Structure formats: structure tokens, C-alpha cells
Amino acid sequence: MNNNITNSIAQLFFNTSFFAFLFLIIIAFNLCLFAYLYFQYRIYKKNPKKANNFKANEYEKIKLLKNQNFTESNKLIATTNELNELTSQLDNILVRIINKPLAKLVNDFLDEQIKQIVKLDKNSSDFHSESDNLPFYTKLFNDFHFGVDKLININIKNPLYNWVYSPSFLISESDFRKLNGISGINKKLLVEKLRIEDIVFTDLNKKYEVNVLTESPIKAQKTVLTVRNILMNDYVDNERIESYVQQANFFFTEHCKKIGKEILESLNIFISSSSLHRHFGFLAFRYSFGQNVLSHSLETAFLTAHLAALIELDSELSLKCGLLHDIGKSNDDNGKESHTITGAKLAEQFQLPDDIKYTIANHHNKHIDNTYCRLTQIADKLSAARIGARSDSSLLFKQLKDELKKIVDKTINNFHTTILLGQSGRRLMIWLETKNQNQLLSNEQIIEMVEKIKAEIAKNPITNHFPIKVVIRYNFEHSFNTKS
């Protein structure tokens, strides 16, 4: 019994001693920590700088790194500005190159730059001695024989199509009855199915002059083909007219496919898309300022490929960029949409390479960051500016027609008007269509309208150079001359 009590007391004393010892250790640690903190406090009170020395050093390091980063950032900004300046200078140089007249362009840029690139010798066999005094661009064009007539043997002109924007031809009285139909029903159907503005018949004493009103050469070609089909057959009705229109559309489309395929394959460009062949073939019947678009595309393609070869770029890709840059002009129903937008859509449809897509969409832009597009842009300007490429008479005729259209729209603003300018600009025909079915014109109103048109034509510096016979048709025909 006593032994058990003794053991219990000993065990209790051991446990109590252990906890007491642990407690003393904790108290001693806290006292040491307090003493250290108090010592640090005394040092800080006496010398704060010494106490914060470590923090100051770290701060200086951070500040130094920040300054270094700021310096590097300034260098990067300066480099970026220099690059932007160089890019701007390059753009200005290229803009001057593209916008200068052809002679200045060559004298200031192409003549020296291309010579330096290819290191041409004046005695080189590439250019004969008789042309040594010619500008370099002339030698370049002569050497590569630019122009569709020399590049490929293909007839791209229709003899019935003239440069005044509307086919005009004579037919007999019986053919007139066939084309016009009873009360003009055949003519109305033709206009509707061919999607042209109008077909106008002018009585010339037992013969009729036919004028197809459309500014689309493609629609003009289809109309002429349809008229030929009608005149070759004795009997015509609505069903046959629709059939003739379909035949003309099919024949014309197949003809354009053949043109496109033959030209592309002659250039070793083998594309299986018949739709692309068709669009490319359409360019043979499109004109821009008197210049055939197919001819212009071929010139641009060959010049782009040659320039690319001189600076060791991909000539084949450059050829395709130049060849297809105006493919958007093939679309006859794009309305007011730019040919670059239409062309970009076609490029996506045909899954053309990215460089070609970019060139088609951007070759008229001022800022270009694609080398192939820039070369195509230069070649495009060279082809358009080449002497004889664009007809001055065609430009003047278009300018005259635009001015006369403005005068007519300004003077006769209450009517829908259609005009046809023929005889090299010396005969203007105006068709009036009332916007309101109940709107009628008296003889006095017609005469007043005539006097206004005559006065506007007389005071316009573009339209008053020579007499113009103006014919107004509204239920009856009224004609007058602008000069006696």
C-alpha cells in the first residue's frame, strides 16, 4: 500500500517537473526575443540609416533595374520610330513612282534602279544599238512585246460593238416587226430577259436603226447574239425568244470559258475551275478607259513577272498576281461595288493563294505591306500609262457623256431619264419616263425643258465645243440643235 502511494507521488513529481521545465524554456525564449527586439530598437533610435541599410540596397537595385528597362524601352521606341520613318519614306518614294507620268517615272526610278539590279550593259545583245538612246522602259516593252495582239492570237472584239458604249446596226422593216412584236411585246421581253436598259428603233424610211441601250459590253454581246438568232428564224414567239436568250447566254459563256482556259494554259497555268476560266474570259469583253481589260491584265502579268525576276522573287506567283489583279471587273452584276471587293470574293471562292488574294483586294490601296502586290501595282500603272494603251478619244467621249448626263439629270429632275450618245458625241437621245403615271407634259413644258438643256449645254466648257443634236422622246419626238 505504501509502495503504491510512493510510486504515485514519484510519477506526479516527474510529470510536474517536466511541464515546469518546458514552461521555463518558453519563458526564456520570450525573454531573449524581447531583449533582441529591444536591442534593435535602441540601434534604430541611434542610427536609422544603418537599420534600413538592407532595404535601401534592395530599393536601389529595383530602381536601377527600372532605369535600365526605361532605357531599353526608349531604345525600342526610337528603333520603332526609325522603322516607321523608313517605311514612310519608302511609301512616299513608291507613291511618287506610281503617280508620276511614265516618262518621269522611268527617268527618275526604273531606268537607274532596274539597270543596277540586273547590271545591264549598254552593249548587251538584249537591246540593239538602234535603241540605245531610248528610255529603259521603252526597251523593256519592246523586248517583251507587251500587248494582247502580240502575246496570243485571239480575237477579242466584236465587229458590231463600237466604242460609243452601245451596239448600233440597221435592219429591214420585216425584221423590225419580228424584233418589236405586236405593241412592242417582243422588245419588252428581250429587255427583261437580257437585263438591258432598252432597245430603241429609229425609223429611217423602210429601214430601222437598232440601238441597244446598255453600258455593259457583255450584255451587249449577248443581245447581239440573241438578235442574230431571232433574225435567222422565220417565226418568233415568247417561248422561242426565251430559248434564243438562253442559247445566247450558253454560247457566250462557253466562248468565254474557252478564251480563259486557252490563255491560262498558254501561260502554263492549269486550273481546273471552269468558273474561273469563264470569269477570266469575260475580261476579253470588258474595257476600262478604252483599254481592253484582258490585254491590260496580260501586260501587267508579264511586266510583274519580269520585275519579280529582276529582284529574285517568285516569277510564277508574280505572273498570277498580275494576271488576276482585275478579275473583279469580270462581274457584270456587281452594281456599285468596287472591283477589288468583287475580286476578293472571287479569290475566296476559287481558294487562290494568299498573296494573290491580297493583291486582288489591295492593288489600289496607298499603303501596301506585300511585295507581290506592290510590284503588281507598279506594273498596273505602267500598263495603263503606256503610250497608246488608253484611247484619248474614248476618255473625252466618256467625259462628254458624263457631263451631258449631269445636265439632263439636273434639268429634268422629275423624270427617270435614259440617254444614248452617238455619232462621236454629236447626237444625244433622251428618253423620258414619268415617275408618276398621272404626270403628263404639255408642249409648253417640253419647250421650256428644251431651252434649259440648250442653255446648260451652251455654257458648259466641255459640251459647247461643237453642235450636238438633241432628241427628246416622250410620247412624241422633239429634236433641236444646240448650235445653228
Curated annotation (Swiss-Prot):
It holds the Pfam family HD. InterPro entries: HD/PDEase_dom, HD_domain, HDIG_dom, Ribonuclease_Y, RNase_Y/CdgJ. It is found in: Cell membrane. It is a single-pass membrane protein. Residues 293-385 form the HD domain. Residues 166-234 form the KH domain. Gene3D superfamilies: Hypothetical protein af1432 (1.10.3210.10). The chain crosses the membrane at residues 18-38. One of its GO terms (cellular component) is plasma membrane. One of its GO terms (molecular function) is RNA binding. Its EC number is 3.1.-.-. The keyword Cell membrane applies. Keywords: Cell membrane, Endonuclease, Hydrolase, Membrane, Nuclease, RNA-binding, Transmembrane, Transmembrane helix. One of its GO terms (biological process) is mRNA catabolic process. The keyword Transmembrane applies. Endoribonuclease that initiates mRNA decay. NCBIfam families: HDIG, PRK12705.1-3. Belongs to the RNase Y family. This is Ribonuclease Y. The gene is rny.
